[in-house]
Amino acid sequence: MPQARYKPLVDRLAKDIRSGRLPPGTRLPTHRQLAAREGLALVTATRVYAELEAMGLVSGEQGRGTFVKETALYAGQSIDLHSAAADMVDLSFNYPSLPGQAELLRVALRQLAGSGDLEALLRYQPHAGRLHDRAMVARHLLRRGLSVPAEQVLLVDGAQHGIAITLMALLLPGDVVAVDALTYPGFRLIAQTQHLELAPIAAAGAGPDLEALEKLCRQRSVRAIYTMPTMNNPLGWVMDLPRRQALVAIARKYGVILIEDGAYAFLAEDPPPPLATLAPECTVYISGFSKNIAAGLRVGFVAAPLPWVSKMERVIRATIWNTPGVMTALVSSWIDDGTVVRLEGEKRQDARARQRLATEVLGPLPRVGHPGSYFVWLPLAEEVRADRVAVALMREQVSVSTAQPFATSAHVPHAIRLALGSVAPDALRLALAKVRRAIEQHTDC
């Protein structure tokens, strides 16, 4: 079809969607129907819908068809942190904080200001961090069941940066990475910028379908597996020991790198050992202090096999040179005096209290989650569209996430993810009531 006819069709459909002439939720003609109606080749009709999907105007749903999306939702929802209105209750992003943390920071900064090595913190630091600070993080990791020497710990600018340096140091564009079909959006974002191919693995209970994973490894040259075995985001599962051992066996059999994300692992009480303990020779363990202490610190860490450390150091040098010494010194002092352990314990209690509140307020709504996590996954009935629920809640001054940012496959389930850790309990109760009401109203439509 000549481009003069092809582009105007895309423009016309886009205009109809943006103007509301084709309202959100409208089922569009099938590819064959569109081709017949417009006199197109089937491949051209497919291209029309692909362009509309790239513009964020439609979504193709396997087995259901192509639907008009809610355009009121901002792009990259739950990946990009936007400045919210003062009266907006944010259930899309987790940045848990406890009363009194600001005073802890004041005290710690005064102590740091009086320390003897303050001038040293104003200089450039080693790319992987000062050895003293790395040793403190290694000590912290012992509480997670992971024993590594300080030389194998690298300090980074938050766990997100830890993921980035791992992918940049160990993988090449075009490499295949196995991931959960629903996973942390930040990983997907970095993988896209590095031009990696994500191969989604469906869930099977509390973890990925390992039969499907092994089949993938037999058929494709899988370079890495990214997983959150302890407090998966967004589903909250904690893999049991046999499943972890089976996952490790697959990685070893096929020579695959394991990338273990432990961002929320501190919330689990007595979890099985990390994958990095079970397979230290092929596992990179990534976590940070944003969730267990405060998001504004932006201090994370990577524990990696020794042969990979120098590659990662070079990437740290290329991206940030070093993590700010003042921040790493602050974290080290809080590890040393027990503040981190205390805050983690208090946040475990806080997360469980918020989960109990969610159970009480959400009532009979189907949900998936862990009693100790800071998030809840709400699968919706087949006739309910998640984007319409999300827009309705935005009008009620409540921000939530749909499944779209978490999905790594073409099949995007209609579901809502709630982040419970960022608002005061009273505001959370009111917001959860609005969520329940919005879902029930759309279910009854």
Write out the residue ranges for each language-model feature.
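Short hydrophobic/aromatic beta-strand micro-patches
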Residues: A303, W377-P379, A419-G421
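PLP-dependent aminotransferase class I/II
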Residues: Y285-H370
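N-terminal basic, amphipathic alpha-helical segments
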Residues: M1-A113, L122, R317-P324, G345-A353, ...
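Short beta-strand(s) of the beta-wing in winged-helix/HTH DNA-binding folds
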Residues: P23, S59, V284, V400-S401
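Walker B catalytic acidic pair
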Residues: G262
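Short Gly/Ser/Thr- and Asp/Glu-enriched loop/turn motifs at secondary-structure junctions
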Residues: G63, P149-A150, G369-F375
